[in-house]
């Protein structure tokens, strides 16, 4: 009997256990993995993907024409362990007839929790307060010391009322938010009804909101959306939060707005680039809280993401419907 030819799968990083187990149990696949928690160097990715039928990658892996050329004609499926797909050269992938799987929905709640945590941390100045306790700055009670801004009776503006934007609004509503505004490509009256959210223009949202949360996808239309003009329209008491993509924000303009007191504070879970250099001007500001892109970082969510990414890959290799396929 002629031996069955195995399909080669290349995985660009150590992924959580549930995804690893699913791939290991696939008798029709030969799995090779970059055995590190650190990003795979481009040259190693080119080497590893050569001849592969399937590629399981992460958001930090830039799958461009060079990588696709290195993979060759065997490559049939790319599965990314992310909801974002801006790291994939989609036009080139579509041209080659390669199917793409991704992991939406499973990280919605976790990312929304992080957004609310970051908003509260930023508006109530928690990092500053912790530092004052540690360095001896806490000497006595003072009427205005470390005063921040509260959510009760506030106006919250959400840029992008998609799955994550809605989940954020749902969690903020019990804090006594008086008014929700949102902006996007088009009104979403059915989704907005739950929060009585009003569809407004981006300039209106900037001018009227006490808190702004960016939760949109990165597209040509949203790249650099939050710039000098945007920040100049904001209230001086407003707090700006970004949990979408770093490139939605002009970080030089954000720095100027924060340093000059044009806006009160900002909290970022995403930056450009990632990681942000330790000498970046934003890191010198007390009124800017920056996290290392941990929106989906819970054990349960990351395991679920890895399993979905593995199942997408295996289904694609076998010519079956993927649990979550990106329509190209």
Swiss-Prot record:
Homology family: Belongs to the D-isomer specific 2-hydroxyacid dehydrogenase family.
Native organism: Homo sapiens
InterPro entries named in the record: D-isomer_2-hydroxyacid_DH (IPR050223), D-isomer_2_OHA_DH_cat_dom (IPR006139), D-isomer_DH_CS (IPR029753), D-isomer_DH_NAD-bd (IPR006140), NAD(P)-bd_dom_sf (IPR036291)
Domain of life: Eukaryota
A biological process term (GO) from this entry: dicarboxylic acid metabolic process
Extent of the signal sequence: none
Tissues expressing the protein: Ubiquitous. Most abundantly expressed in the liver.
Protein name per UniProt: Glyoxylate reductase/hydroxypyruvate reductase
Complexes and interactors: Homodimer.
Record's catalysed reaction(s): glycolate + NADP(+) = glyoxylate + NADPH + H(+); (R)-glycerate + NAD(+) = 3-hydroxypyruvate + NADH + H(+); (R)-glycerate + NADP(+) = 3-hydroxypyruvate + NADPH + H(+)
CDD domains for the chain: GDH
Residues annotated as catalytic: 293
One MF annotation (Gene Ontology) recorded for this entry: glyoxylate reductase (NADPH) activity
Positions bound to NADP(+): 162-164, 185-188, 217, 243, 295
Disease note: Hyperoxaluria primary 2: A disorder characterized by elevated urinary excretion of oxalate and L-glycerate, progressive tissue accumulation of insoluble calcium oxalate, nephrolithiasis, nephrocalcinosis, and end-stage renal disease.
Pfam families: 2-Hacid_dh, 2-Hacid_dh_C
Binding residue positions for substrate: 83-84, 245, 269, 293-296
Top EC class of this enzyme: oxidoreductase
EC number: 1.1.1.79, 1.1.1.81
